[in-house]
């Protein structure tokens, strides 16, 4: 931060605090807040996607990056126009990152404009990036110039500061993220889920976020399936209804296949019932309440549901 010269031992220069009246605020013309990826990722927004290791978080992050850079779509979300993206990857080997982007490129059918996606891949760095360190924040800043979306993959590898479950450990990264928002950028964090299924570490991360998405394993998920998950919006600021309802996504040979989470559950329940399982046995198999199984059976019996 530059500023007026300071005498030796004086406090570092800081911008003056600005207060305005309600009348001034109401008279202020703010530019409309656009969507980077509709309906859940706004411009100057802060969001997080978390899930178990190996479930498909990086697949999702790269798919989002490609959609935003090309003005395209990914899963059930749409980018209204092309925007520049910077991906900070702290975990994936370079060859794996290259392979996944090549796969996305082949299936997308549209190329990213030159320079619209730039990456800081872990394998290409001589040292790790740590967003909790002010020196690394300052070094990174020139590389973010012109970017609209910054994807941080992931918090555990790129924001190491103290103990992960302590709220204070998040504060330096939160300060950096809020600075990005003031600069007009959107930040999307990726994070791991803990053993209980919730995001790992302090829940204080969610305080300043617009959107929190959990990627969860469907009840019948098998490890060999790879990228297949249920998308759940745990925090949805500014949108609701159908746009915020959970759905399932699976990556196949031809690309991503989606279906409503309710329909997927009905299908699983009816399949188990067809195998002769009782309501109690189905509930135990899927790890849900009997009342939920009964509702699914009722829905599955409706005309046109199967």
Feature map (PLM): residue ranges:
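Short helix-capping segments at alpha-helix termini
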Residues: 105-112, 180-183, 302
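C-terminal regions of RecA-like/P-loop NTPase motor modules
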Residues: 5-14, 19, 145-146, 182, ...
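Conserved RecA-like P-loop NTPase ATPase core
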Residues: 41, 87, 153, 209, ...
């Amino acid at each position: 931060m530059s500023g007026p010269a300071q005498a030796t031992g004086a406090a570092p220069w800081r911008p003056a605090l600005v207060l305005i009246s309600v009348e001034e605020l109401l008279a202020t013309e703010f530019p409309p807040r656009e969507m980077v990826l509709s309906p859940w990722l706004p411009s100057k927004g802060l969001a997080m996607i978390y899930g178990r290791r190996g479930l498909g978080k990086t697949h999702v992050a790269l798919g989002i990056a490609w959609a935003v850079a090309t003005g395209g779509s990914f899963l059930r979300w749409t980018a209204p126009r092309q925007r520049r993206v910077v991906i900070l990857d702290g975990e994936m080997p370079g060859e794996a990152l290259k392979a996944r982007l090549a796969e996305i490129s082949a299936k997308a059918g549209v190329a990213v404009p030159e320079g619209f996606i730039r990456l800081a891949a872990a394998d290409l760095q001589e040292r790790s990036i740590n967003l909790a360190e002010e020196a690394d924040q300052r070094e990174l800043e020139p590389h973010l110039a012109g970017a609209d979306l910054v994807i941080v993959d992931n918090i555990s590898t790129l924001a190491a500061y103290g103990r992960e479950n302590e709220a204070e450990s998040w504060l330096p990264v939160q300060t950096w993220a809020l600075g990005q928002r003031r600069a007009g950028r959107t930040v999307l964090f990726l994070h791991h889920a803990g053993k209980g299924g919730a995001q790992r570490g302090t829940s204080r991360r969610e305080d300043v976020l617009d959107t929190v998405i959990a990627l969860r394993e469907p009840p019948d998920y098998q490890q060999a399936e790879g990228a297949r998950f249920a998308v759940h919006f745990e925090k949805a600021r500014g949108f609701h209804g159908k746009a915020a309802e959970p759905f399932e996504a699976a990556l196949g040979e031809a690309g991503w296949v989606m279906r409503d989470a309710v329909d997927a559950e009905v299908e699983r329940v009816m399949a188990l019932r067809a195998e002769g399982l009782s309501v109690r046995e189905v509930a135990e198999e899927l790890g849900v309440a009997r009342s939920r199984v009964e509702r699914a059976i009722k829905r599955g019996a409706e005309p046109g549901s199967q």
